[in-house]
Amino acid sequence: MTALNHTPLNAAHRALNARMVDFGGWDMPVNYGSQIEEHEAVRTDAGMFDVSHMCVVDFTGSRVRAFFEHALANNVGKLKTPGKALYSCLLNPQGGVIDDLIVYYFTEDFFRVVVNAGTAEKDIAWFNQLNEQGGYGLTIAPRRDFAIVAVQGPNAREKVWATVPAARAATSELKPFNAAQVAGTPFGDLTVARTGYTGEDGFEVIVPAVHVVALWNALQQNGVRPCGLGARDTLRLEAGMNLYGQDMDETVSPLDAGLAWTVDLSAPREFVGRPALERDGTRAAFVGLILQKENGKAGGVLRAHQKVVTPHGEGEITSGTFSPSMQESIAFARVPAAVQLGDIVHVQIRDKQLPARVVKLPFVRNGKVLAA
């Protein structure tokens, strides 16, 4: 049996009596007692997540922009001011999703990317291959000397500023999907990004791994609640945010995973996967589902891999959960393209087909329920 990877916060999680699970080869906290209370803390106040299993990768060289114009489905031409961030898919030549990631522009010869934990080695090998094939001459450096703490919720930014006063001046004017570098804090030099995976405001803080325990403890002392992967999943599902490996993978086009908005076909760029996307187009709809109640009760919970029966053919749930914010069972589903918003479809749950309504994603943003 292979030993699990540990983040630098592993001992801190155990000291808080976290329930630990194997998450893609990493020993990670699923909750610290109450997943529901952790979810509510993020929706109403501030919670924090250890996301140090994700990998920071630095790209340096004079042709780094040209490299990403070729490598990514979204267009780094949109990145014009230092610290600006972009969400994108990394595609294979068949148009399937190798990973989804965030890329940060700092200078014309320095970009930073944050990739998913389970795909990091595969991503880096692919980046190295593209770099070599294209003769870009970049230095590609995985930065396992960094950790990442995501602080999320309506009070998250204020609590980060209370913990790291030097960050206030650098980040108080940051718009969403922008980052600032904050040097000389008690926790080392930080990259503070106004990004997240919960549908709430907040920061993701890239911090030297040697300082992350001190930052974590200081945030907790300032009233930020530790949250595990369980709450992270219900929050991101409510927020309509995809999970790699579940909602899309190398066999799925971003156009069939609700990610067409991340694919920029407007510019004449020859990016990897573009010919396949243009050839195949959109073949399925990616929608939200809300399980319908009968006599005030739902007959089950929507879960991944359940079959969805529609008049236009069958589909499948990719992610599902019980929503603490809505008190409803919700899901993402990939269904035939002819399925429309407002339609009633049927989900196979054990030996029953239960009705579910098709809705537009997201379900919840900034504490407000959007899907009715």
From Swiss-Prot:
Q: Which GO terms describe its biological process?
A: glycine decarboxylation via glycine cleavage system
Q: What is its EC number?
A: 2.1.2.10
This protein's record includes keyword DNA damage = no
Q: Which domain of life is it from?
A: Bacteria
- Catalytically driven reaction(s): N(6)-[(R)-S(8)-aminomethyldihydrolipoyl]-L-lysyl-[protein] + (6S)-5,6,7,8-tetrahydrofolate = N(6)-[(R)-dihydrolipoyl]-L-lysyl-[protein] + (6R)-5,10-methylene-5,6,7,8-tetrahydrofolate + NH4(+)
Q: Pfam families from the xrefs?
A: GCV_T (PF01571), GCV_T_C (PF08669)
Q: Which GO terms describe its cellular component?
A: cytosol; glycine cleavage complex
Family recorded in the similarity comment? Belongs to the GcvT family.
- Functional summary from the UniProt entry: The glycine cleavage system catalyzes the degradation of glycine.
Q: How does it assemble?
A: The glycine cleavage system is composed of four proteins: P, T, L and H.
Q: What is this protein called?
A: Aminomethyltransferase
**What species was this sequence derived from?**
Burkholderia vietnamiensis (strain G4 / LMG 22486) (Burkholderia cepacia (strain R1808))
